[in-house]
Amino acid sequence: MAVGKNKRLSKGKKGLKKKTVDPFTRKDWYSIKAPNPFNVRDVGKTLVNRTTGLKNANDALKGRIVEVSLADLQKDEDHAFRKVRLRVDEVQGKNCLTNFHGLDFTSDKLRSLVRKWQTLIEANVTVKTTDDYLIRLFAIAFTKRRPNQIKKTTYAASSQIRAIRRKMTDIIQREASSCTLTQLTSKLIPEVIGREIEKSTQGIYPLQNVHIRKVKLLKSPKFDLGALMALHGESGTDDQGQKVEREFKERVLEEV
């Protein structure tokens, strides 16, 4: 008889479950902080695998992009249709310091703006800010009825559309190229550029629902920690105290 392993006897018991390890035990929570132009600084929390060996948690967090509603950042429901993208640039302890990375409209808001009997005019401009951020801004506008107009439709002629688009690009170029990214963000929140376009194009054709619907960050300058700390209200350098001048008094030791 051949001597060998009895396969039937060496088989393990069926139905034994493999021990499962909860993946959240290997992760840590980090707070996401919004930069200066926004009213609410605490955006939320994010998870990352704990630092083990050569894998650093900070490196895994840097470059992460989070999308937040502008209504949550400003505590104003009127901004609910706009989404802000923030990029994690630095990690300080358990805090992720972010910078502005883009802006977009919700799809339902965009679809609600498009209607019959009016002309849609779009324009986009690629511009560099004073702090060397290369961004592309997309603008959208719609024609509206003139005062005392009887006609149902509000279609603009091709020459009027070209003139309005030229005006839009000029205003966006002027407003965006003369300020830093932080100052531009401050202009985008209250729709300063949209109102300026609406006011300046009244002579060509009256417009409504003029918005910067999208902002895309194409290129960033070299990372500056001091500038990021200033955005988050923190100084990159240690505070030095003032010199205190006092009269020197020689201490006399008592004789023992």
UniProtKB/Swiss-Prot annotation:
GO MF annotations, alphabetized: structural constituent of ribosome
Any GO BP annotation: translation
Residues that bear N-acetylalanine: 2
GO cellular component: cytosolic small ribosomal subunit
The entry's keywords: Acetylation, Cytoplasm, Ribonucleoprotein, Ribosomal protein
Signal peptide: none
Record's keyword annotation contains Transcription: no
SMART domains linked: Ribosomal_S3Ae
Subcellular location: Cytoplasm
Entry similarity comment: Belongs to the eukaryotic ribosomal protein eS1 family.
Subunit architecture: Component of the small ribosomal subunit. Mature ribosomes consist of a small (40S) and a large (60S) subunit. The 40S subunit contains about 33 different proteins and 1 molecule of RNA (18S). The 60S subunit contains about 49 different proteins and 3 molecules of RNA (25S, 5.8S and 5S).
Name of the protein in its database record: Small ribosomal subunit protein eS1
Source organism: Fusarium vanettenii (strain ATCC MYA-4622 / CBS 123669 / FGSC 9596 / NRRL 45880 / 77-13-4) (Fusarium solani subsp. pisi)
